[in-house]
Amino acid sequence: MELQEVLHMNEGEGDTSYAKNASYNLALAKVKPFLEQCIRELLRANLPNINKCIKVADLGCASGPNTLLTVRDIVQSIDKVGQEEKNELERPTIQIFLNDLFQNDFNSVFKLLPSFYRKLEKENGRKIGSCLISAMPGSFYGRLFPEESMHFLHSCYSVHWLSQVPSGLVIELGIGANKGSIYSSKGCRPPVQKAYLDQFTKDFTTFLRIHSKELFSRGRMLLTCICKVDEFDEPNPLDLLDMAINDLIVEGLLEEEKLDSFNIPFFTPSAEEVKCIVEEEGSCEILYLETFKAHYDAAFSIDDDYPVTSHEQIKAEYVASLIRSVYEPILASHFGEAIMPDLFHRLAKHAAKVLHMGKGCYNNLIISLAKKPEKSDV
């Protein structure tokens, strides 16, 4: 089965769907001030036609209500900054393209649009028709828009996904090179980590080269991804998956060869690795780059009627459900659907242990980029 056929969130609105389990979380809330600053710089740059129609794309938008929460933040930021900077001007139309792979459940977003538009009108005073949302399916490692046609490109929790499993893992190192893990975890051998870094470098370079061409000169990108900081990082969601899969092997419910032959196309770069790639590619300048921590259960709320002793387990089950909604399609394609309930039951146990220790944070990186002006524009 082709990777792009399974590289999507759980579809629909069922108990394990991304639409039901994903919600506005602390990580998105932390991104919003950076988003507003990025929009402020964008509006001050006086790009072509920006006072009439701002063209925006959300790359790797996923599906369900969470997608429109991100769109809401973008629209609110544009309106807020626009009022602060140019309050004498009429609000520009905002055209937003939602991008993800062809298998993404775009329909779960489209059917929410009528109520979303009404809410924008009621809460933000944006007349229906002044914000236009459409889909642009396809890999963001390929061309999506005409040259110099976009003002702002946004991507949240997407660029850590690679275009493919690093070829070096199989071609150069052999099928079982990454024993005991599904990605480039801290305990992986250096050649495995290098293979993943090489693939990320190739992919992120392609991403920057292609999409910088789609931006107007001095257009902006704002990218957020999971990252690594040092060897003392707390377990991230993929580490929890590693633990749960290894539990199934120890219990005899899964063959070790199944794990050794599977690698997920996911890489957590360091801030320095991202910085070096941007500088080497050369089409954009870094305006700011920061890291921050977000908690597994940042979006979780609980009724006070629950006994305190049950909070950790309930939170852990929430964490497991959220991780399942993101990773189940690609995991089920390799390990089989039948083992999924057992896998995520064990993941919830590991999440509970991590939460009990007062841990459960993962590192995030946010970077704001501006396309360098052409020499003729300087």
UniProtKB/Swiss-Prot annotation:
Catalytic activity: 7-methylxanthine + S-adenosyl-L-methionine = theobromine + S-adenosyl-L-homocysteine + H(+)
Chain positions recorded as Mg(2+) binding sites: 178, 260, 262-263
Gene Ontology molecular function: any one: metal ion binding
Keyword set, alphabetical order: Alkaloid metabolism, Cytoplasm, Magnesium, Metal-binding, Methyltransferase, Transferase
Tissue spec. comment: Mainly expressed, at low levels, in leaves and fruits (grains). Also present, at lower levels, in roots, stamens and pistils.
Pfam families associated with the record: Methyltransf_7
GO biological process: alkaloid metabolic process; methylation
GO cellular component entries: cytoplasm
Record keyword Metal-binding present: yes
EC numbers on record: 2.1.1.159
Note describing how the cofactor binds: Binds 1 Mg(2+) ion per subunit.
Residues annotated for theobromine binding in this entry: 157, 160-161, 362
Binding site for S-adenosyl-L-homocysteine: 18, 61, 66, 100-101, 139-140, 156
InterPro entries cross-referenced by the UniProt entry: MeTrfase_7 (IPR005299), MeTrfase_capping (IPR042086), SAM-dependent_MTases_sf (IPR029063)
Subcellular location: Cytoplasm
Pathway: Alkaloid biosynthesis
Site (Involved in substrate discrimination): 154, 266, 337
Record flagged with keyword Hydrolase: no
UniProt cofactor(s): Mg(2+)
Function description: Involved in the biosynthesis of caffeine. Catalyzes the conversion of 7-methylxanthine (7mX) to theobromine and of paraxanthine to caffeine.
Family statement drawn from the similarity comment of this UniProt entry: Belongs to the methyltransferase superfamily. Type-7 methyltransferase family.
Name of the protein: 7-methylxanthine methyltransferase 1
